[in-house]
Every structure is written in structure tokens, then in C-alpha cells.
């Protein structure tokens, strides 16, 4: 693990013997901050995520997030460039050096279009959805689930390709729940780590004897697809009005009619938003359906889907 050193007078930091210049703050939330930095060795921009670690458990969770990144070398999953632990007296900061995406997140794009009175077209949605699915497929193939998929956790590359980020909530894909104590512990964990308006129904009220699997991500993916289609998540307004999301997700989702969307896309969304997780499709099934729906490349014959 690299060592970090702050040279505040020059606004630079050193990670793994490379110097980075602080440019500006990008954002903050909870106990973490994200800064834009420039690598003085290569002139490239990076996002430096700094996690405040008040306890040993915080350090372990930050290390685990770094370990999750290192599991993957995939175009649709955010790459970790470097990881360092910085000591400041009795406190520590975990630093994750990540690629910088100037286009921001999928949510930024949805909001930008909405401000213009527009939405993503189906021909734009389908390749995005395919890329997100491929990222999830890679995560699930290694026996993990993302558990906090949402538009703000999906970056957009220069060519518009989706890249999954924020792997701090990832855990094992298949969880065998055996008893009320374990069920309550998992439910409490989900309340803290899984965004409420994108959280699968089975995580709101975990049964004493059940199996929670990676299809929680498929539900969240359905919420992301809904947001791409309609400009907001299906339960965003429920949460904003102070109504019960836990109650709302127990009912079948009503999908608005729109001439912008094919029946095939609507059926795909409906399958993802199946309340019973055992009836929800796995990612490989969705991938095969999605690949058949992809818009043709420029110059190819187009058919209505």
C-alpha cells in the first residue's frame, strides 16, 4: 500500500511517489470528499476520493472498497489508479485515486436534458443499458452484488460509455438468511448502504429465512432504466413527498405510456421491476434480450423495435 503525504503550501499531494496538484473540489458526502487533481508526471486529471476514517472499522471498509476496485479490469467498472492511507495524528484518511470523467454522471446527463425539456431517446438508452448490464455481469460473475446502483453512481466516458462507480456497498451476491437476528442486521445494513428510492423490495423487510441474491441489482437497474426513460426514478417523488417507499415498492409499478418507447423496452422494464425477486430475471437473460434490441450501427438497415 502506498503512503500519502500532503504538501499543503504548494497545494500538492504525493501518492506512490507521484506528485499531484490540487485543482478544485468536485463534491462531498457523508465522511468523504472528492477533489480534482492533476498528475504532474503525466498532465492527466484524476479524481481523488478522501474518506475520513474515525475508527479501525472505517479503515477496513475503505480498504475493502479499494480491494473491490482491484478485482476488475473492465471497461464498464471504474478503475482504481492508486490507494493510500494518510495518518494525521490519531486520525486517518483513506485516499482512492480514480480516473476523472469530465462528462460527469448519468444523472447529470438526465438532468441536463430535462432542463431542455428533453429525454434520452431509446437509441441512446439501449447502449447505455447494455454497458451497465455488462458491468453488473462482471461483478456478479465474481460472486458479488453492487447493492447501490443508481444514476449518480454511473459515470459517462468520453464516448458516452457507462462506467459503474462507488463500490463501497458491494458484498457477496448470495446471502443465506437464517434467523430473525441476521435478517434484522441485513435490513439495517441495507438502510445505511442502499439508496432508499433504488432499494429492492426484499431489502426493506428481510424475511427470517430467505435468500437475498444479486437480483437486488436488477431491481435497481430497472429504476435506473425508468429514470433514463422518464427523467426521474420511479420512487423519487414518493421519497421527496415523505411517503413510504417501503410500501410503494410492494405494489406493481405503473409504467407511463409514451410514444418514445417501444413495447419491447417497456416489457424489459416491467421484468426488472418484478416485486418477487425469484421471478426477476438474472443479468445474462437481460443481456441476451438487450443485445437483440440494440440499434443498428450507422449504415446498417434499420428496423422498428
Curated annotation (Swiss-Prot):
Induction: By TGF-beta. Gene3D superfamilies: Phosphorylase Kinase, domain 1, Transferase(Phosphotransferase) domain 1. One of its GO terms (molecular function) is protein serine kinase activity. Residues 166-202 are annotated as: Activation loop. The modification Phosphoserine is found at residue 197. A lipid is attached at residue 2 (N-myristoyl glycine). The active site is at residue 148. It is found in: Cytoplasm, Perinuclear region; Membrane. Residues 20-293 form the Protein kinase domain. A lipid is attached at residues 6, 8 (S-palmitoyl cysteine). It holds the Pfam family Pkinase. GO terms for biological process: cellular response to transforming growth factor beta stimulus; positive regulation of transcription by RNA polymerase II. InterPro entries: Kinase-like_dom_sf (IPR011009), Prot_kinase_dom (IPR000719), Ser/Thr-specific_kinases (IPR052239), Ser/Thr_kinase_AS (IPR008271). Keywords: ATP-binding, Cytoplasm, Kinase, Lipoprotein, Membrane, Myristate, Nucleotide-binding, Palmitate, Phosphoprotein, Serine/threonine-protein kinase, Transferase. It is a lipid-anchor. Expressed in heart, liver, brain, spleen, lung, skeletal muscle, kidney and testis. Membrane-associated protein kinase that phosphorylates on serine and threonine residues. In vitro substrates include DRG1, ENO1 and EIF4EBP1. Also autophosphorylates. May be involved in secretory vesicle trafficking or intracellular signaling. May have a role in regulating stromal-epithelial interactions that occur during ductal morphogenesis in the mammary gland. May be involved in TGF-beta signaling. Able to autophosphorylate on Tyr residue; it is however unclear whether it has tyrosine-protein kinase toward other proteins. PANTHER family: SERINE/THREONINE-PROTEIN KINASE 16, SERINE_THREONINE-PROTEIN KINASE 16. This is Serine/threonine-protein kinase 16. It comes from Rattus norvegicus (Rat). The gene is Stk16.
Amino acid at each position: 500500500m502506498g503512503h500519502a503525504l500532503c504538501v499543503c503550501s504548494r497545494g500538492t499531494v504525493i501518492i506512490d511517489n507521484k506528485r499531484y496538484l490540487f485543482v478544485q473540489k468536485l463534491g462531498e458526502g457523508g465522511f468523504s470528499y472528492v477533489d480534482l487533481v492533476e498528475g504532474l508526471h503525466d498532465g492527466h486529471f484524476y479524481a481523488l476520493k478522501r474518506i475520513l476514517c474515525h475508527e479501525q472499522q472505517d479503515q477496513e471498509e475503505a480498504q475493502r472498497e479499494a480491494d473491490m476496485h482491484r478485482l476488475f479490469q473492465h471497461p464498464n467498472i471504474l478503475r482504481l489508479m492508486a490507494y493510500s492511507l494518510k495518518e494525521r495524528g490519531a486520525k486517518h484518511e483513506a485516499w482512492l485515486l480514480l480516473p476523472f470523467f469530465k462528462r460527469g454522471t448519468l444523472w447529470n446527463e438526465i438532468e441536463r436534458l430535462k432542463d431542455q425539456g428533453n429525454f434520452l431517446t431509446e437509441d441512446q438508452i439501449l447502449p447505455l443499458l447494455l454497458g451497465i448490464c455488462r458491468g453488473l455481469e462482471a461483478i456478479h460473475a465474481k460472486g458479488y452484488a453492487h447493492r447501490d446502483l443508481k444514476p449518480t453512481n454511473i459515470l459517462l466516458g468520453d464516448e458516452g460509455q457507462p462506467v459503474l462507480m462507488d463500490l463501497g456497498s458491494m458484498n457477496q451476491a448470495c446471502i443465506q438468511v437464517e434467523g430473525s437476528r441476521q435478517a434484522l442486521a441485513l435490513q439495517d445494513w441495507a438502510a445505511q448502504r442502499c439508496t432508499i428510492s433504488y432499494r429492492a423490495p426484499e431489502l426493506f423487510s428481510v424475511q427470517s429465512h430467505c435468500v437475498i441474491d444479486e437480483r437486488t441489482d436488477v431491481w435497481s437497474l430497472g429504476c435506473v432504466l425508468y429514470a433514463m426513460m422518464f427523467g426521474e426514478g420511479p420512487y423519487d417523488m414518493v421519497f421527496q413527498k415523505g411517503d413510504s417507499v417501503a410500501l410503494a415498492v410492494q405494489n406493481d409499478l405503473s409504467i407511463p405510456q409514451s410514444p418514445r418507447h417501444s413495447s419491447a423496452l417497456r416489457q424489459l422494464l416491467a421484468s426488472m421491476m418484478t416485486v418477487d425477486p425469484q421471478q426477476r430475471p438474472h443479468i445474462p437473460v437481460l443481456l441476451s434480450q438487450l443485445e437483440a434490441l440494440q440499434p443498428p450501427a450507422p449504415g446498417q438497415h434499420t428496423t422498428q423495435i
